[in-house]
Amino acid sequence: FMSGHLVVEAFDEGGNIIAYRQTDNEVVDDGEQCILKMLFATPQTSNSGRGEYTSTGACTGTLTGAWTNIAIGTGTTAAADTQVVLVNETSSTGGLERGPATTMTWTNGTGADSTKIVLSRTFTSDSLTAHTISESGLFNSTVGDANGMLARQAFTGVALSTGDSITITWTFTVGN
């Protein structure tokens, strides 16, 4: 059993909190299929790292690494299992581009305790244009036009002006 949670915190230039959101996230079909293929991969196959199974419709992109890259966007479409990219990623917007998590914390569970990982990244806007951030995704690549999305979630928009920052925190729990 895998569950996920997303926390969004926004701050103005002075460090004052201007928005807080939290919600469960949507692990998309691509992510679910890729997780299983990576777990049960056979290294001697041509699809090394993706298992030896034929992919149709999901997990067809190259698995270039762990899902540690966080992206944000302005799309407002609800999260859906079939999505493979953000609706409108801020891939070329000053300070709001996709990048690796700057904090990753593992908790190893035993017995009744769950195992989890918490990944977060802070984006600081240096754009002269205001943006309303309303979606985030977790990817296995820093390339903005690549697939490889594990999870996505939309949330009530957070308006950012120059100097404002937004911290995205993804938590994934496996087990109990």
Question: What do these predicted regions represent?
Answer:
Residues 1-134, 141-176:
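Small cysteine-rich, disulfide-bonded extracellular modules of the LU/uPAR three-finger superfamily
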